Amino acid sequence: MRLLIIEDERTLCDAVSKSLEKDGFEVDVCYTGAEALEKTGADKYDLIILDLNLPRMDGMDILKKLRLNDQETKVLILSARGNAADKIAGLDAGANDYMAKPFHLGELGARVRSLTRRRFIQHDV
């Protein structure tokens, strides 16, 4: 399973990436919205982990652009914006799940496994 992490905080990105790689996922990372749109245009991912607070391009804008061309790829928002209004907006914009920072790596791993398992089952049916 291929994952893309879109997160500008490199230390956090590295920790999440290493944790998910230990779970057997192939992980790519990008640190800007422009880089994210370029990668998603060129490559196919099973799941995208998306921060909302990115430089020069808001994560919600990235999500909306992704959803114009791709309704299949699962998207998990991972953001410091943890209030109910932001969660509702993210899910309404097409995210499949939403986690607020700070978070536990074990919980993130469980959510990623759940989302990718559901995607795998949907393709088999």
Region spans (language model):
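N-terminal/domain-start alpha-helical segments
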Residues: M1-Q122
